A protein has these predicted regions:
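Short, conserved loop/helix-junction motifs that constitute active-site signature segments
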Residues: 103-108, 518-520
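Acidic Gly/Asp/Thr-rich repetitive segments characteristic of extracellular carbohydrate-active
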Residues: 55-96, 100, 164-167, 575, ...
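N-terminal secretory signal peptides that target proteins for export/translocation
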Residues: 1-16
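Extracellular beta-strand/beta-solenoid scaffold signature
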Residues: 109-112, 155-169, 190-201, 219-230, ...
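Bacterial N-terminal signal peptides
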Residues: 22-33
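Right-handed parallel beta-helix/beta-spiral solenoid domain characteristic of secreted/periplasmic
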Residues: 70, 105-193, 212, 217-219
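Acidic, glycine- and Ser/Thr-rich low-complexity intrinsically disordered tracts
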Residues: 37-64, 128-153, 325, 330, ...
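Right-handed parallel beta-helix
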Residues: 111, 175-186, 204-217, 233-248, ...
Length: 602
């Protein structure tokens, strides 16, 4: 393979260039994807039908190699590269401005790779996480340690120094690019930068892999989006460290932030692969939906990520960090789905979220939304369907799950919200006071005039809500919510175990667990749960038959309860809830499988 060096003044010409014709886009797509779980379900939820094939072997660049030295023109090299070429950027160098990825007629055997020229041996392995250590940064205040004993700067840095634009901009029609070993950021300042890697909602873009990148804003500046997926298909965000995405305004120029976001616009969207990343954002760490759309993103794989918000972003905390004006960043949740279908959330750690702005400190929101913009409801086709959440740990939150079908602020009706499977999840350190919310495990509800919530299963969950186990809402004139299953869980009930979301016409207004379940759900299954420390005024007769009522957490016989904060929630061999599930397994999460799934997630 022949290599070329581009001096600072060199312009790469198109002389002799040949284009690779794409005979069939369907064939090209098939070469980067596989039928992953086609026809497979987790409980009621269909699993993704297609996964992005993002291994290095699946994204070959067999063409020429070009090197852009420090001070060279990266854009010239990219503009003139042929499909299949590799462009090397100088390790440790800074390239200022915007890198635009232009449309080229590439195919699945001829990717354009843009990467640091540091050798592979100087980078994390192809399935290992990038951290700031590889940019010479040994630690970041308020973040988990990334075990950097020998920091080294082997990344090439792309830094945007303006306003209202982006460090990496993906053009309409761009396809078959892989970025490796880059730091992508902005300069500090009071100006808003709306995205670091940006794809417009109106642009048809496909086959992109963002691999082992450090994508970040600055500690105090408003930076809205890390990776904005726009109108894209077959995109992977892998092995990357994304941090300092935040906005300070409840209304105004920068109101919401995400590490990764998409799900709006009229173009086909998905599949997406978001795997083995550190994802930090004040708003939603991941968001799908929230704007005008006439199509739904499909086949979304979210695995092995660490969702995180530094507690230093909470006003009044030691070492508080806010915006350039001193105000706190707007905090919302870890994952919010307003428009998404066939989503797998598997083997993730989700830490730190709180209320105090427009939300109540829930970790996960499954809330289809026909969003209202300028008085118009702009997404009647928005749905959240077929979502699986499993083998994950949620900690330091005001609530676990908000699951609801509701009208938008302008009265917009979503298409559907249904078929959710949640199992083998630990939710601990739920604290409504500290994290400014309700202190509950889950809220389930259907608003007026919207499609009813149905087919929700919550099984083998270990959780310690201090206030309320379930909040339920549905007006009596609505049809009952269908097919609710709550089994094999180990959960503290709190003093208000199954409670009404409010209103005298709510099906849950009795606040008596058995009556609420009978009145709100048809049919329902609520059995073989360990309902820990249920209050004396809610005797066993006020619950469905077939459940267990340990008087306190000690009676459960956890290996180490530790106050419900970071404990070892294995059951001791003598626990009465060992092998007590409907399936012969222990009540609560399968801790062995969960720990194995989370191995290597940091």
């Amino acid at each position: 393979m022949r290599s070329f060096i581009l001096p600072c003044s060199t312009v790469v010409t198109k002389k002799g260039r040949s284009l690779f014709l794409i005979v069939s886009m369907a064939l090209a797509f098939s070469l980067l994807s596989i039928a992953a779980y086609a026809g497979s379900f987790d409980g009621p939820a269909e699993l993704p039908r297609v996964l992005v094939q993002s291994a290095l072997a699946s994204t070959p660049s067999p063409g020429k190699s070009w090197t852009v030295p420090a001070g060279g023109n990266v854009q010239t090299a990219v503009n003139n590269a042929r499909c299949g070429d590799t462009i090397y950027l100088q390790a440790g160098a800074t390239y200022t401005g915007t890198l635009t990825l232009p449309a080229k007629a590439c195919d699945s055997q001829h990717w354009i790779t843009i990467r640091t020229n540091a050798p592979d041996t100087a980078l994390p392995g192809p399935t290992a996480r990038m951290t700031p250590c590889y940019a010479g940064v040994s630690s970041l205040p308020g973040r988990p340690s990334f075990n950097c004993s020998a920091p080294k700067n082997v990344l090439a840095k792309i830094v945007y120094n303006g306003t209202n634009w982006y460090p990496v901009y993906v053009s309409d029609g761009a396809n078959h690019y892989r970025l490796i070993g880059l730091e992508i950021t902005r300069t500090p300042g009071p100006n808003v930068v709306y995205g670091l890697i940006f794809i417009r909602n109106t642009f048809r873009v496909d086959h992109l892999v963002f691999d082992r990148l450090w994508i970040h804003g600055t500690p105090n500046s408003d930076t809205a989006h890390g990776v904005s997926l726009g109108g894209s298909q077959f995109v992977a965000v892998l092995n990357s460290y994304i941090n300092d995405l935040h906005c300070v305004a409840i209304s105004g120029a920068c109101t919401d932030s995400q590490a990764v976001g998409g799900g709006v616009g009229s173009l086909p969207k998905g599949p997406y692969q978001i795997v083995n990343n550190f994802l930090e954002s004040a708003g939603e760490n991941i968001l799908f939906g929230g704007g005008s759309a006439s199509s739904t993103p499909v086949d979304i794989e979210i695995r092995k990520n660490h969702f995180f918000k530094p507690l230093t972003w909470m006003k009044g905390s030691p070492g508080f960090v806010g915006g350039t004006n001193g105000n706190p960043f707007v905090v919302k949740n870890h994952l919010e789905l307003k428009n998404a279908q066939r989503v797998l959330l598997d083997s993730n750690i989700m830490e730190n979220t709180w209320g105090g702005f427009s939300q109540g400190g829930f970790s996960v929101l499954l809330t289809p939304k026909n969003q209202t913009l300028n008085g118009v409801n702009v997404c009647p086709s928005c749905q959240v369907t077929d979502v699986t959440i499993r083998y994950s740990r949620i900690s330091h939150v005001a609530g676990g799950f908000q699951i609801a079908n509701a009208l938008s602020d302008g009265g917009g009706i979503p298409l559907a919200g249904q078929r959710y499977s949640i199992h083998d999840v630990v939710v601990d350190d739920i604290d409504g006071t500290k994290y400014k919310g309700g202190g509950l495990l889950a809220q389930l509800g259907t608003g007026p005039r919207v499609p009813k919530l149905q087919d929700v299963q919550i099984q083998h969950v270990t959780a310690f809500p201090p206030h309320t186990m379930l909040v339920v809402g549905n007006i009596l004139s609505n049809p009952d919510m269908l097919n609710f299953i709550f089994t094999n869980n180990l959960v503290t009930t709190g003093p208000f175990p199954v409670w009404s979301a409010g209103g005298s016409t709510n099906c849950a207004s009795s606040d008596v667990p058995l009556i609420v379940l009978q009145t709100c759900f048809t049919p329902y299954t609520f059995t073989h749960n360990g309902l820990i420390a249920s209050p004396a005024n809610f005797s066993t007769s006020k619950w469905p038959a077939g459940n267990y009522f340990p008087s306190n957490t000690a009676a459960v016989q956890f290996a180490s309860y530790n106050g419900g904060i970071g404990g070892d929630y294995h059951l001791l061999s003598g626990s009465p809830f060992k092998n007590a599930g409907t399936d012969g397994k222990d009540l609560g999460a399968d801790i062995n499988t969960l720990n194995s799934a989370l191995s290597g997630v940091y």
